[in-house]
A protein has these predicted regions:
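Enzymes that bind and transform nitrogen-containing heteroaromatic metabolites
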Residues: 1-177
């Protein structure tokens, strides 16, 4: 049976982005995201879909929105997280994909925390808000409770990876206890 997992990148303060985009450019992490999610269903909220500007290639894109007349070309549109997970699991089982990925945004990540079995989190050695001199709205990653989650030492970086674009980075894979 496929695994349901979330994947995100966050800065030192847990910032994911602005709600409509990211505050950094780390090409090596983008490549990591592509490798992890390629061939798998990806679930995202409408704002994340719109920030992307279109479907992620080589993936089944599933968009959650409460707008019943919403059209997302190249994606399946559903109206609830539960419906998106059901569809993602069916697609993964039919295609042999090992994982159904939650890919954002902040509300979808938060709502999915009780459902997912894994979290793949890229930690960026960067304070994105300070680096960009930006004020205004930012969104944060969900809190990871160590009583619920443990790092998988086999899938977790012991050290920082080299700087790519704006920051050095490392990945921690969290497994539900």
């Amino acid at each position: 049976m496929p695994v349901l997992a979330s994947i995100w990148a966050q800065d030192q303060r847990g910032v994911l982005g602005t709600g409509t985009g990211m505050l950094w450019n780390v090409p090596a992490d983008f490549a990591h995201f592509r490798r992890e999610t390629r061939g798998c269903p990806v679930i995202m909220g409408r704002a994340s879909w719109e920030a992307l500007g279109g479907a992620l290639p080589e993936r089944t894109n599933i968009v959650i929105t409460t707008r019943h007349d919403y059209v997302a070309e190249g994606a399946h549109v559903v109206t609830s997280l539960e419906e998106s997970v059901d569809l993602g699991m069916r697609v993964a089982e039919e295609t042999g994909a090992p994982t159904v990925w939650i890919t954002g945004g902040a509300r979808v990540y938060s709502d999915a925390m009780d459902l997912v079995q894994e979290l793949v989190v890229t930690y960026l050695d960067l304070d994105a808000v300070a680096a960009r001199g930006r004020s205004g709205r930012v969104v944060h990653a969900p809190q990871i409770d160590p009583l619920v989650w443990r790092p998988d030492p086999e899938l977790t970086d012991a050290d920082w990876r080299p700087v790519s674009g704006d920051a050095r980075w490392r990945v921690t894979t969290w497994i539900r206890r």
